[in-house]
Amino acid sequence: MSLSPKNVSVTNFVLVGLIEIESFRYVCAVLALAIFSVTLFMTSMIVYVTWTEKSLHEPMYILICIMVMNVMMGNASYFPKLAIDLLSGCSTISLTGCLCQSFCIDLYGTYEIFTFTTMAYDRYLAVGHPLRYHNLMTNFTTQTMSLAIYVFNVVIVTVGILLILRLTFCGVNINNVYCEAMSLQALVCNDITINVLYRTILTLFISIGCLLVIMYCYIRTVVICLKLSAESSQKAIHTLMTHILAFSIYIATVLFLNFRYSLSTGPISTKVDIIIPLIGTGIATSANPLIYGMRTKALREKIVCNLYKIVGKPKE
């Protein structure tokens, strides 16, 4: 029987990256669990205080909750399995599991950009149109907008997964520590022009479009604050630089993950495949609950109060 692509049925893949880091797998496992645990704790605290405190039932805090929950979803699709695989010595993943992980990672990535954009727009309205803000950005509007964006993202990510399903796999070795769409496309026998075009156009459209909106909103916000007072100006610039740092690390990682296969002429170092996703989707994204939650005064105070209650010590 001929072993042509049409006759090859792939049910499992090998995550080569896990084999490459075998010598220090316990260190990586501890790091993965630490990042996931911190993210889970911070996300839980932010969501809990926002849900229970009526004073926080406002668009800005709703958006912060949506962002940290999305970060939690992204980390949950990556770090727990990574830690389990490293501790157990397992380096394989099923086709179904691979597609599910790819779907969750892509959904997290696209929804994160839109959340950044919505938050920038919300702050622009709050500073630039304070008298109309509560009419323009109600809780219902925020929730409806976020839900519509989420559904849109589910659709575009599902289309990407379906485009992969129509292909035939010729290999099983994924040069990474987890599954994502570009890794799978590198293993197919068919022409992937449609897949590459779809992802490239979508990535450029979303990234550039959202980046322009974010830049416009924050620049306008800073300009308005400069006209108010020196204190407001200082706070706005400090907040803006924090947001730019978090967003820049995130967007650079997304672009790298999407273009590394299409732009490279040879195999990419497995160590690079490990370091970039770990920093980009791990440490950088896990910082979001701190950046957007703990640096927000109202949230920070409520979280501290709840922590004092947990340890049974009255706040001084």
Describe the predicted segments one by one:
Residues 1-316:
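Transmembrane helical core of 7TM receptor-like proteins
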